[in-house]
UniProtKB/Swiss-Prot annotation:
Keywords: Ribonucleoprotein, Ribosomal protein. SUPFAM superfamilies: Ribosomal protein L29 (L29p). This is Large ribosomal subunit protein uL29. It comes from the Bacteria. It comes from Alcanivorax borkumensis (strain ATCC 700651 / DSM 11573 / NCIMB 13689 / SK2).
């Protein structure tokens, strides 16, 4: 997920994307805790994507 793609989305779309990423992060954390995760790098990737979405949301909201 690139920042340029996120900048084109509306605030509502960004909020929906953030919710989806948080759900995915939760699922990956549960897999990690139970030892079922095979691609451990996905957890870090999702975390960085959440940070990207939050950054763009702040820019759009002017805070």
């Amino acid at each position: 997920m690139k920042a340029s793609e996120l900048k084109e989305k509306s605030v509502e779309e960004l909020q929906q994307t953030q919710i989806e990423l948080l759900e995915e992060q939760f699922k990956l954390r549960m897999k990690s805790a139970s030892g079922q995760i095979s691609k451990t790098h996905e957890l870090g990737t999702v975390r960085r994507n959440i940070a990207r979405v939050k950054t763009i949301l702040r820019e759009k909201q002017g805070n």
